[in-house]
Amino acid sequence: LPLTIDGITTDRALDYITLSFAFAVGQVMWGFANYIGGMIADKYGDEKALFLGIILAASGCFLIPFCDTTIEIVIAIGLLSAGGAGIAGLAVAMSAVNKKVPEKKAGLAFGVLNAGGSLGQTFLAPIGVIIIINFGWVFALNCLGILLLLTLPFTYFLKDQKVRKQSKIDDQKTDIYMMI
């Protein structure tokens, strides 16, 4: 997203300070959304948390070109894109991988996951610049949104057979039964 700043400030009625504020809100939201993503993953499953995060991040990418006011850009960048990226972040992805691989291969799986994320970031920036130069920032954001949506089918394979939905009351009942 930062690669599109010049295009946004040129084509929209937004200045650099407004965009900086939207990205600052996004940084706070991203950190907070990591916790939300973890809670969603614990209660409903990793695949649902990743699915929701991807949808939010993609919707933010698609909405950015239509933003003309501060509140609109803060919602698109700061809440939707960053919030979605936080919910579907590395912590939830690692949790999903941890449930799918044997314990002896967990280190390798985490390494591959981290390396894949770094490799993606390494290639996405120059490809994004090429797309922006040749086709414009709006097309680049739409490509990013589509790329995010293309990852949605992979969330199906992360579906956990058993999602724990125990409450504290259930845990207390179990403790009482164990004492008896």
Walk through the language-model features, giving the residues of each.
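Helix-breaking motifs and short loop linkers at transmembrane-helix boundaries and internal kinks
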Residues: A13, G45, F66-D68, P102
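Residue-level signature of mid-helix packing/kink "hotspots" within the transmembrane helices
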Residues: Q27-Y35, T122
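Helix-to-loop junctions at the C-terminal end of transmembrane segments
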Residues: A33-G45
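C-terminal ends and interior cores of transmembrane alpha-helices
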Residues: I55-D68
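Hydrophobic core of transmembrane alpha-helices in multi-pass small-molecule transporters
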Residues: E72-A88
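Intracellular juxtamembrane helix-capping segments at the cytosolic ends
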Residues: I87-V101
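Helix-loop-helix hairpin linking two adjacent transmembrane segments in secondary transporters
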Residues: L113-V163
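Flexible cytoplasmic inter-helical loops of multi-pass small-molecule transporters
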Residues: K159-M178
